């Protein structure tokens, strides 16, 4: 790893339909085996279904869903004197959004609806209402951090 200079982060181009950088990142996280056009079709289909069911702007629903799933704290393992402690650490804003998107996609993949756009739409609507598997994952993460608050002084 070079020590000389900080490497510039790659600029993410906004998605073609809604012009949102966040949605472009969501498409990339959903994508499997480099099939970006398929991921775009799934997301745009899911957002179409969300706008039908919720009678709201799909981008507003997506933003609220992400807000309800974003974790504030997480636990990281830290080895101290032969024992491994789960140390609660605050999550950086960039990682918050990435984790939220990743958890939404994971939760959607585990659902039982027939097609992926139906599953993703269902998970987005659930997260928008503050329920669903992705929101539960966030609550579990927060609970773990709260339970291990005593080890917060091991932060690095």
Curated annotation (Swiss-Prot):
GO terms for cellular component: small ribosomal subunit. GO terms for biological process: translation. SUPFAM superfamilies: Ribosomal protein S7 (SSF47973). CDD domains: uS7_Bacteria. One of its GO terms (molecular function) is rRNA binding. Keywords: Ribonucleoprotein, Ribosomal protein, RNA-binding, rRNA-binding, tRNA-binding. It comes from the Bacteria. The keyword tRNA-binding applies. InterPro entries: Ribosomal_uS7, Ribosomal_uS7_bac/org-type, Ribosomal_uS7_dom, Ribosomal_uS7_dom_sf. It holds the Pfam family Ribosomal_S7. Gene3D superfamilies: Ribosomal protein S7 domain. Part of the 30S ribosomal subunit. Contacts proteins S9 and S11. Belongs to the universal ribosomal protein uS7 family. HAMAP family: Ribosomal_uS7_B. One of the primary rRNA binding proteins, it binds directly to 16S rRNA where it nucleates assembly of the head domain of the 30S subunit. Is located at the subunit interface close to the decoding center, probably blocks exit of the E-site tRNA. This is Small ribosomal subunit protein uS7. It comes from Nitrosococcus oceani (strain ATCC 19707 / BCRC 17464 / JCM 30415 / NCIMB 11848 / C-107).
């Amino acid at each position: 790893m070079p020590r000389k200079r900080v490497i510039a982060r790659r600029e993410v181009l906004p998605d073609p339909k809604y012009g949102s950088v966040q949605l472009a990142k969501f498409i990339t996280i959903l994508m499997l085996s480099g099939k970006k056009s398929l991921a775009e079709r799934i997301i745009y289909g899911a957002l179409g279904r969300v706008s039908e069911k919720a009678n709201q702007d799909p981008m507003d629903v997506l933003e609220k869903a992400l807000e309800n799933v974003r974790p504030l704290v997480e636990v990281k393992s830290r080895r101290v004197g032969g024992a491994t402690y789960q140390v609660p650490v605050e999550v950086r804003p960039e990682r918050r959004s990435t984790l939220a998107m990743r958890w939404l996609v994971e939760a959607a993949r585990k659902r039982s609806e027939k097609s992926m756009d139906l599953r993703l739409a269902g998970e987005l609507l659930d997260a928008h209402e503050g329920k669903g598997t992705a929101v539960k994952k966030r609550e579990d993460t927060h609970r773990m951090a709260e339970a291990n608050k005593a080890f917060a002084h091991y932060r690095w």
